[in-house]
């Protein structure tokens, strides 16, 4: 009887250790995956906004680097802006 109980208790102990370790590693792995996902997302958005010039800033007409609107050439200077047209009624 004692010889049968010892292996059963040992197996239960090892299974409990394995389950605890699996839960711990899953949480730790999930955190690192979430962290790397945030890094990828941040680099994606930084690439989208890189080189974007705000309204009124100097721009290159051939590069299309304005955040909003387009690159307008006004009095020998190129600036980002939105061209509004006035319509008379």
From Swiss-Prot:
* S-S pairs: 52-67, 59-71, 66-80
Signal peptide residues are 1-22
Keywords of the record, alphabetical order, are: Disulfide bond, Knottin, Secreted, Signal, Toxin
Highest taxon of source: Eukaryota
The residues of the propeptide are 23-50
- Tissue spec. comment: Expressed by the venom duct.
Q: Name one GO molecular function term.
A: toxin activity
What are the GO cellular component annotations?
A: extracellular region
Q: Where in the cell is it found?
A: Secreted
State the InterPro entries in the record.
Conotoxin
Family, similarity comment: Belongs to the conotoxin O1 superfamily.
Its domain description in UniProt is: The presence of a 'disulfide through disulfide knot' structurally defines this protein as a knottin.
Name of the protein this chain belongs to: Conotoxin Lt6.5
């Amino acid at each position: 009887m004692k010889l049968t109980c010892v292996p059963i208790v040992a197996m239960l102990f090892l299974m409990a250790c394995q389950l605890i370790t699996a839960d711990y590693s899953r949480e730790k792995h999930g955190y690192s995956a979430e962290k790397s996902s945030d890094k990828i997302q941040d680099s994606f958005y930084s690439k989208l906004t890189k080189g974007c010039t705000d309204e009124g800033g100097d721009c290159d007409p051939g590069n299309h680097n304005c955040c909003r609107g387009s690159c307008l050439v006004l009095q020998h200077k190129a600036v980002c802006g939105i061209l509004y047209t006035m319509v008379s009624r």
